[in-house]
Amino acid sequence: MKKRCLDESDIFACDFETTVFACQERTDVWAAACVALHSEDVRIFGNITDFFQFFVNMRKTVRLYFHNLKFDGNFILDALMYKWGYRPAYLRLPNGEVKEISDKDMLPKTYKYSISTMGQWYKIIIRTNKYKTIEIYDSLKLLPFSLKVLGKNLGTKHQKLEMEYKGFRFPDCPRTPKEDKYISNDVLVLKEALEIMFSQGHNSLTIGSECLKTYKAMTDDGLGKWESYFPNLYDMPGTEGLSAGEWIRKSYKGGWCYLRKGCSGVTVYNGTTADVNSLYPSMMHSMSGNYYPVGIPYFWNGDYIPEDALIENRYYFLHVRTGFKLKRGKLPCIQIKNSAMYKSTEWLESSLIDGKYRELPGPDGIITSTVDLYVTMTDWQLIKEQYELWDTEIMDGCWFRTQIGIFDSYIDYFAKIKKEAKDKCTRTIAKLFLNNLYGKMAMSTDSSFKFAEPSNDSFVFHDIHANDKRPGYIPCGSAITSYARCFTIRAAQANYHGNNRPGFRYADTDSIHCDLPPEKITGIRVHDKDFCCWKLESCWDTAVFVRQKTYIEHVTHNDLEPVVPYYDIKACGMPARSKELLLSSMLGTAKMSECKTVEDLQFLFSSGKRIMRTYDDFIPGLKVPGKLRPVRIPGGVILQDTFFTMRNS
């Protein structure tokens, strides 16, 4: 069956409101809203079945967008299994594996879904009859902001409202006008946001896919240029028994997030935070001077780098076996994953274990403190600058021909839109396109998914492993992040003046934090907008850095202009509500009337008096209420109140 292109009138923005009350053992949808694009006729149903039947009765395929399908989708899957008599469109193979049935081969009253093993929900496809499906997409993957931020940034006519979620409600219960207004605004904000994106032709499943589609349209000449530049390296032989793509992928790492040794929990004073303007687009653009690998790799084996890899316009990747120790006054740049001997998140000062060369028994023989590194050419150059190396042996490698400026047309196009934007909406969309292309270049073949099976009136997920996804071009993906790490590390190094002197303290991918005034920040080009430059985003009079992605700065200036001082709290995994509670405890502004739970009250007050907290309380072990933990129960998912707990690194 040929898939029909959807009219925008066949696309709906949707939302559920679900029951939340004490000691509940089941949850249900008590209000379900939808609105078609280019309409303001919001329909609200009192239960999930009436909502679903509304779309079943339409004689056409429709697409529904929920903003955070991970939540609403649980209610849909539960109803498909237990209420509506639909069957999963998957086959159980004789070996126990599960295979997804293709869209065209789905039978009536069947469904399937796309949920990654990391728990990311993408879509649900429901075949209602031979000719019609209901497609359910997660708009959060295309527009990665909360509805509140989305409405504000895109300037939608409607804005998200506030409502108390807790209370005794049930399917088809009476609703107040305020409740109807709340859920109506939720779908109207989403509808307007989708209209803006679709009006510009941006209708892919995710923002990353949309970026790649746009880049390919700008780049491909229809004569094979795309395939010659970015072939599928997972279909090509590499070395060490791996495909070329698998071998090169070992060199791929994320951003440089590093807290200077000895600085954890220490209050520092009079500092500056500098941020790179669009780090990844900067590194991808030709103004950075960076060349990128294209085409096919040329592998070699042995302890050398061939002359062909060292001439101009080449980029190489290495598998190196070496011992290493950080040079005096240098910052670390080596991180080792999947090793029993080293923490996977730690940037290492030495390959030595407890300061000694060690040989330890391992499952595959002897493990030594001479380690195997898979690195880009860019990484290798920096490693040699930062470390003393010994027993170094190149095991194998590969090189590529290179091009400069291969991303320029794409980046220039969206940078111009962002720079000339007269409204926040246009600027926000341009920024999305600038910042989300690089990740698609590193996309792997991993297409593993979760498979849901009924269990105790609910369902449980099992991971099904698969590797049949079209990958990105990993040489570029790895080189982009490598160039970005080195850019940040060199800036941090220029401002590091020793452990006992003011200077670089902390970095997080595209920012450096130094206890130095702005005029003493060195080694960077400062400009508030230009690529490859740093913006002096804030100045602070005090700060404390605890671990990666966990710190507080008391900001006094933004963009070098004085502001009313405020605390900027960053703590990985800490939700906004927990930050609000911690902040009110630090400022002494807590009010009993604003406490939503007993835990809030106990955190903020003792014997009727406010509990005052300082930097000294911002340490591992700190527990702050305000975090919501999703728990699957019959009917769907509830969000249980729990604590954010600061863990040891």
For the regions a language model picked out, list residue spans one by one.
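Conserved Walker A/P-loop ATP-binding site and its immediately adjacent core
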Residues: 69-73
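Conserved acidic
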Residues: 6-7, 26-30, 36-64, 74-649
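N-terminal leader/early-domain signal
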Residues: 1-4, 8-9, 14, 138
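Two-metal-ion RNase H-like nuclease active-site motif
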Residues: 9-20, 272-274
